[in-house]
């Protein structure tokens, strides 16, 4: 540019591309070049620079003010939040199964896991349409059963999980029911079964043996069942299909995506049980109560509730009513009431439930509100030269209370696990979750597990964190898969966040898996826009992590620069709150990569036209300005 005056404008325009980088050193060099050789009258240069205003640092904008159009956004003290769509809408209604043809088509897809709700939708559809199938349709089940056998014998696709194995086993039981009901038309199904049993017997004594001859979803075992809730729902469906009486609907079948139930539909289903004086299945009822959309404000709801009687009416009036509506007896089914109380307000202990056996258990197992902490410890290994090599590790853990029904086995060891059982013969749905940490490769099942209790996912998220998100260095396929599944589920869920949800969100901003970090940023962006997230709470958790070196701070600063800064004036205000809360909790001894965090903070103060005012942050800044590499960043904050 110095030598070729005729190309200065072109060179400045080309150099402007470097403003995509948020690095201060890079932008300052480009600013110097443009100020030296750029013409303020150049419309081409102005147009090019306008493209990069979103990635320009505040100081860069100030230096290049003469080259920029005056289009600064208005700074407003009040912000408009994006509207939160209601859960129950016409555009997210799950299409009903209205014929036997629809039923068979759905069954052909259920093992593909195309939709999260297909598993439950098939169960509800079978109960409704099974008896209406014609004999000529039975042969259409053969390819469906072929896929079920293949999944059980060879493991299925990379999208299949343990729940799909349970569904495949259930389909085998259903095929036996069809063979019994249509002996001639189902001959093809019977031949398929005999062929697969014969093939399986050749594997006897080997790893791939499945014992198809005796395999049933009702199999009794002394081993812990991996996913007992879904197994109970499958068994309940089979009971209804085998019953000679007109089957009643499953209560837990979702009506709206991803997996919600409209309150009006649940009331209509319960009316059918009420009219026939039939007892709902306990786990089916608990799951239905867990999935009901609590925000529904239908004007018809009070009228519909009056169509129920006794315990049904009192139960749903309590669950769907305002927060101050208290439970009214009779309490003939404690599991229903306890589950309704947890869905409505997990932090509230209702005195009306004081005699329930569930209260004997540590309440943390019901709410997921375990105390957590990060700490450092020294680990070591012996290398090839028989020399002991030590290093400092950081880990995230929960304090698990021990009692008569909860024990920590192999405490503080690599194979630590929790043993827990319910005091009640009807365990709560959330009491099933502690078993999950024992099993590998559950990422394909996690979304469906989370949607068992969409109004209170924290009891599940605790075990996801314990299972795969406890160490910031973990980036193996299993851990990354579980982390991604957990944070993606958090993105879809619509519950009110409690501590563990905030812990998962903040922790995923520091994990090794880049995809999970990106998800965490997207969740923050979306919830800030809707006004339903506490950024300061996230900052406090992040500072706690940094106290013990849990996760490199660079992962967070890179994430902020790439996705979280300059989304909107509102987001910049919230990001400032997050960083202030984080700085407040940091030690006086500078943590690694603190310089970049301070530079981002200085940038936000400039953008937001605000000043550092927190007394503890000001105290820390005074301490840090004596550190050579932090001096300039601190000066930019204090000016």
Name each model feature, range by range.
Residues 1-13, 26-31, 37-639:
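Alpha-helical structural signal with a strong bias for long, charge-/Ser/Thr/Gly-rich
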């Amino acid at each position: 540019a110095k030598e070729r005056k005729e190309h200065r404008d072109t060179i400045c325009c080309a150099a402007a591309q470097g403003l995509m980088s948020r690095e201060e050193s890079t932008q300052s060099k480009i600013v110097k070049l443009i100020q030296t050789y750029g013409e303020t009258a150049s419309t081409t240069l102005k147009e090019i620079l306008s493209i990069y205003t979103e990635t320009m640092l505040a100081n860069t904008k100030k230096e290049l003010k003469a080259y920029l159009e005056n289009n600064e956004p208005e700074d407003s003290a009040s912000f408009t939040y994006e509207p939160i769509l209601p859960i129950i809408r016409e555009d997210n209604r799950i299409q009903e199964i209205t014929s036997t043809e629809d039923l068979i088509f759905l069954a052909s897809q259920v093992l593909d896991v195309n939709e999260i709700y297909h598993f439950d939708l098939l169960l509800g559809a079978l109960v409704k349409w099974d008896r209406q199938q014609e004999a000529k349709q039975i042969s259409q089940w053969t390819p469906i059963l072929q896929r079920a056998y293949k999944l059980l014998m060879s493991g299925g696709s990379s999208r299949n999980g343990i729940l799909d194995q349970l569904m495949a086993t259930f389909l085998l039981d259903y095929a036996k029911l069809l063979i019994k009901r249509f002996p001639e038309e189902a001959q093809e199904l019977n031949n398929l079964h005999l062929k697969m049993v014969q093939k399986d017997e050749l594997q006897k004594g080997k790893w791939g043996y499945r014992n198809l001859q005796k395999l049933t979803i009702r199999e009794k075992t002394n081993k812990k069942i991996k996913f007992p809730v879904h197994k109970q729902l499958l068994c309940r469906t089979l009971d209804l299909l085998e019953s000679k009486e007109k089957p009643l609907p499953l209560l837990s079948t979702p009506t709206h995506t991803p997996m919600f139930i409209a309150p009006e539909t649940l009331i209509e289903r319960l009316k059918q049980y009420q009219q026939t004086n039939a007892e709902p299945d306990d786990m089916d009822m608990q799951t239905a109560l867990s999935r009901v959309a609590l925000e529904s404000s239908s004007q018809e709801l009070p009228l519909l509730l009056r169509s129920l009687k006794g315990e049904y009416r009192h139960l749903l009036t309590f669950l769907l009513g305002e927060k101050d509506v208290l439970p009214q007896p009779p309490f003939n089914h404690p599991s229903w009431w306890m589950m309704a109380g947890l869905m409505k307000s997990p932090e509230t202990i209702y005195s009306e439930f004081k005699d329930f056996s569930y209260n004997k258990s540590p309440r943390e197992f019901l709410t997921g509100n375990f105390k957590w902490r990060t700490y450092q410890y020294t680990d070591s290994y012996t290398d090839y030269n028989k020399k002991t090599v030590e290093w400092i590790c950081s880990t995230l853990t929960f304090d698990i209370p021990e009692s008569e029904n909860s024990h920590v086995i192999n405490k503080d060891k690599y194979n630590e696990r929790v043993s827990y059982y319910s005091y009640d013969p009807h365990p709560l749905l959330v009491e099933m979750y502690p078993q999950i940490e024992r099993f590998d490769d559950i990422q394909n099942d996690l979304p469906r597990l989370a949607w068992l209790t969409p109004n209170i996912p924290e009891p599940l998220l605790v075990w996801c964190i314990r299972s795969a998100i406890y160490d910031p260095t973990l980036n193996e396929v299993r851990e990354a898969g579980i982390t991604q599944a957990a944070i993606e589920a958090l993105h879809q869920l619509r519950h009110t966040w409690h501590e563990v949800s905030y812990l998962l969100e903040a922790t995923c901003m520091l994990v090794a898996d880049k995809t999970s970090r990106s998800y965490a940023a997207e969740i923050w962006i979306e919830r800030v826009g809707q006004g339903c997230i506490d950024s300061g709470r996230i900052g406090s958790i992040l500072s706690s992590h940094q106290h013990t070196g849990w996760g490199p701070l660079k992962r967070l600063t890179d994430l902020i620069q790439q996705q979280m800064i300059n989304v909107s004036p509102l987001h910049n205000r919230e990001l400032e709150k997050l960083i202030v809360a984080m700085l407040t909790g940091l030690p006086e001894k500078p943590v690694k990569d603190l310089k970049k965090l301070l530079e981002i903070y200085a940038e936000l103060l400039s953008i937001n036209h605000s000043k550092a005012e927190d007394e503890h942050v000001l105290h820390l800044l005074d301490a840090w300005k004596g550190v050579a590499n932090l001096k300039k960043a601190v000066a930019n904050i204090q000016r």
